[in-house]
C-alpha cells in the first residue's frame, strides 16, 4: 500500500468562473430523477420512497414507489451520488434541486459539487441546503450566490458529495471549546473532588481565577458559534 500526497490547488472564485460567460445563458431544461443515480459511493446510498408529498414522482396509490434518495442514508462525510445527463446546447445552466433537509434541525448541510470530476470553483466546495420540514425547490448555491455552470454539448457527470463545508470551521471551534472546558473541569475537580460539598464555599474566584476567567471566555465563544449558526 502507498499514500500519494498532492499539493493543494486554489480554486478560482465563482465571480472569476462566471466572468465573461453571462451572455451564454440558455433556456434548455434537463430533468433528472434523483432515484436513478449513475453511481453512488457505497451500497448504503440507495433509492428510497416518499409518500408525504403528492408531487413527488413516481407515485402510486396502491404500490410503494422508489422516488427519492438520501435522507439519513446519505449524510456521512465523503458519501456521494453521481448523475449522468446530456446537454444539447452550450451555455450556462442552473442546477435546481427539489429536496427536503430535515435531518439537521435549524442548521444547513453542505454538498461538494463536481462537474465531470472537477470542482469548478471554490464556492462549489460547500453548496448549502437549508433546514425545513417541507420540500424545497432551490438552485445550487451558497446562500449568497446562485450557481450557474457552463456546459458544452455532450454527456456530463454531476457529483454531489457530503462535506462539512463551512461547518468544518464551526466543528473545530466547538472541539477547541470542549477541550478547554474539560481542562477547566479537571482543575475544579482537584479542588472539590468528585463529590463536592454543596454547603461549602470553595472560593473559585479567589483560588482558581484563571479557570473562572477561561470559563467565561469559552461561554462567550460558544455564544458566538450559536449566533453564527443561527445567523
Please describe what each predicted stretch is:
Residues 1-231:
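Extracytoplasmic
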